[in-house]
Amino acid sequence: MLNFDKESILEYSKVGCSGVLALASNYLASIDDKYTVIVSDILHHSGLVNIDEKYKDRVINVGIAEQNEIGVATGLVNQGFEVYASVYTGFAVARALDQIKVSMGYMQMPIKIIAFDSGFNDSSLGLVYNLKE
């Protein structure tokens, strides 16, 4: 079980977003057989490379395909899965926005988006990772 007392929160802050996502994913996968995470080629950056071996089949890497990530998530939600989509913030806003509007807005699919690194956090990766919108 994940705790949210002062000591636990201090420990979570030491491992960062990706470490907490791995901890949360292990916990959620242990209590929910339908828990699934979809990533768009950010398995290492999201920390999901550290998910327990017994839950590896719950992580789907669609490659550099943020638009398709939302489409795959929609299909899985439609089949009863609890889906979280992990994506760079800039790519969720710019590349997958149409799919987000249709799938989550119009179709009301309860996909949870976990967005990483907004702003200039990943400038070393190139200009496309800088979120200026």
Question: How does the language model describe each region?
Answer:
Residues 1-133:
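Thiamine diphosphate
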